[in-house]
Amino acid sequence: MRNVFIIVILIGLVGCRNKVNKLDLPHLNGYWEIEKVTFPDGSKKEYTVNTSIDYIEVKEHEGFRKTVQPNFNGTYVTSNDAELFTIYENEGVFNLNYKTDLSEWHEKIISLSENKFIVISEENIKYHYRRFEPINLEQ
C-alpha cells in the first residue's frame, strides 16, 4: 500500500510540471513586455510600465527579437536591428540560442503559454514576460 501511495505522489508531481512542448512555440510570436525579473539571490524587480517592448517572430526553429516603442495610436517605432535566434531542444527543454556580431548567449524556456512566458539566462536570471496589450487613445 505504501508503494502505491508513493507512485501516486510521483505521478502527481510529474504531471504538475509546466513543461513546454513543440506545439507551444508559436505562442512566442507577437509583442511582449517584461513583467518582472528574478535574480539568483531571490530578489525581484517588477515592471509596471514599459516604454519599450519586444516583438518576437518564430518560423519553424528560427526567429528574431526586436525592441520596439509603442505609440498611443497603436503603432510602433522600431529600428532595423534584430537579434536572431535558433530554437533547439535538449533533454526535453527548449532553448533560445542568440547570436549577433557582438555576442552569443542562450536562454531556456521554462514556461510558455498564450499570454505569458518565462526564460532563464545563463546567469540564472529569470525573465517573466506578459503579452503586450496596446493602448489606443484615438478610439
State where each predicted segment sits.
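Positively charged n-region of N-terminal signal peptides that target proteins for export
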Residues: 1-5
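C-terminal motif of bacterial Sec signal peptides marking the signal peptidase cleavage site
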Residues: 12-15
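N-terminal helix-cap/turn-to-beta initiation motif at the start of protein domains
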Residues: 18-33
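Residues located in well-ordered beta-strands
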Residues: 31-33, 108, 128
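Short, solvent-exposed loop/hinge segments that bridge or flank secondary-structure elements
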Residues: 34-62
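Acidic surface patches and DE-rich sequence motifs
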Residues: 39, 100, 121
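Contiguous, well-ordered beta-strand patches that form the walls/edges
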Residues: 61-116, 124
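Edge beta-strand at a domain terminus
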Residues: 120-139
